[in-house]
Amino acid sequence: EITRLYLGVAENPLVDVIGHCATVGYEFDYEKCMKKFKECGKLVEINESSITWKNTSGNYREIIRLCKKHEVPVIVNSDAHFCTLVGRFDNALKLLDEQDFPERLVVNADIDRLTELITAKKSNILR
């Protein structure tokens, strides 16, 4: 059921980022969905808050492994729920480093790469 929902979301042209996809208890066929996310040009969010507070490291390890395998770009996000945590992604970066995840696939690791993506996806946003 959850796999089917993610496959449907992947086909939605209004969705650019697949967020909170490592939630414990809501696992899905990661392999099948990462392939579909790649095919549909989606980014996968690596969510610091979920890693830190919701014990999603195991699921994220598998998701990151598959994103690397299928060259699915990711976007790292603090998802801060308190002002002092804005911009903190220590655990997310650690998981990416553990997998030797290519920096070129981390969209927001480079401002030019991020701007290019935003411009391509939503050309009228930056005007």
Where are each of the predicted segments found?
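Active-site glycine-rich loop that binds ribose-phosphate moieties when present
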Residues: 1-5
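Charged catalytic cores and adjacent phosphate/nucleic-acid-binding surfaces used
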Residues: 7, 12-15, 25-127
